[in-house]
């Protein structure tokens, strides 16, 4: 799973960003559950998911602050 550039994320619509954020939060929940039950094989997915979630949240906040001003 390659990390997308910020410019690629900025091209997404607000609905797509929200959908991906919700999907990543669900994925992180599932990964934590798998880790707790010792079923998780690739622990690097935690880092990848957290980074992508942070990037999406940053783009979302940028849009909110630009529309508020």
UniProtKB/Swiss-Prot annotation:
Protein name: Large ribosomal subunit protein uL29
Superkingdom: Bacteria
GO molecular function ontology, one term from the record: structural constituent of ribosome
Pfam families reported for this sequence: Ribosomal_L29 (PF00831)
InterPro entries for the chain: Ribosomal_protein_uL29, Ribosomal_uL29, Ribosomal_uL29_sf
Lineage: Bacteria, Bacillati, Cyanobacteriota, Cyanophyceae, Synechococcales
Region forming the signal peptide: none
Family in the record: Belongs to the universal ribosomal protein uL29 family.
Organism: Synechococcus sp. (strain WH7803)
HAMAP family listed in its UniProt record: Ribosomal_uL29
GO cellular component, one term: cytosolic large ribosomal subunit
NCBIfam families to which the protein is assigned, alphabetical: L29
GO biological process, alphabetically ordered: translation
């Amino acid at each position: 799973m390659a990390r997308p550039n910020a410019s690629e994320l900025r091209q997404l619509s607000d609905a797509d960003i929200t959908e991906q954020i919700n999907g990543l939060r669900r994925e992180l929940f599932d990964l934590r559950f798998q880790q707790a039950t010792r079923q998780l094989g690739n622990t690097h997915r935690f880092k990848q998911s957290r980074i992508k979630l942070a990037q999406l949240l940053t783009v979302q906040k940028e849009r909110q602050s630009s529309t508020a001003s």
